[in-house]
Amino acid sequence: MLAIPFRGNGGERERVLEKTLELLRNLYNWEHIELFDSNHPVFNRSASRNRGVFAAVQYGCDVVVVCDADSIPEKEPLWAAIHAAHDGLIHFPFTSVAEYPADRIHELDSTLSAARTLGTGWYPSQGGCWVATPKAWWEAGGMDERIIHWGPEDRAFLAAYRTLLGDSVKHEGMLVCVSHGDRGRQFDPADVRIMEQYEHAFGNRDKMLKVIASRGPVR
């Protein structure tokens, strides 16, 4: 199953999503492709991703790909990650991220070759596209839905799954991340404070489980 967290704003995000979906559909023989919005007053990426994994359980899917609406992996590493995910770890179908300009998205095809020449800001990442069994996702605690905005939720989840499951598995390849105007770069201070709880518990299973168990209501 392919689960995509998404809330539109009537602008550029819809155009990016349309092209992203076109490309993602051709990457794998998906049984289900769905968009998820937890319907919190402020779009909650963590909760929306968790809803996608809940749906995968309901559908009886053995593996779920949770992919952001502006992100596109390459076909070969995606297939490799899906077929390897039964090891109970978190998999990433890429080893580097290429930022791609939204105004050139029409030039992308299934090979993603345009991103190799137009992509900028190449960097490693452990977010954007996760591949896992639903069981592994929940054994790592799922994403903390108290972290509402972009950025700290990935880092908190990283600390949790590395502590509770082990290091992630990265499959050689590129993730194209489409840059768009409403994609913020400033972390919310309240989100950062929650993220730091996970970072302080990193490497200590008992402490990490306590952090997860102590989660309060969504703000």
Question: Residue locations for each model-derived region?
Answer:
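Hydrophobic targeting segments
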Residues: M1-P5, L24, E31-L35
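Short, acidic, metal-binding catalytic loop of nucleotide-sugar glycosyltransferases
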Residues: N9, E14-E31
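Ligand-binding pocket scaffold of soluble enzyme catalytic domains
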Residues: L35-N39, K75
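A short, glycine-/small-residue-rich helix N-cap motif at loop->alpha-helix starts
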Residues: H40-A47, V53, H149-G151
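Active-site nucleotide-sugar/metal-binding loop of Leloir-type enzymes
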Residues: A47-V63
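Short beta-strand-to-loop acidic/aromatic patch adjacent to the donor-nucleotide binding site
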Residues: C61-I72
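Conserved catalytic core of nucleotide-sugar-dependent glycosyltransferases
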Residues: E74-R146
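C-terminal catalytic/acceptor-binding lobe
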Residues: R146-R219
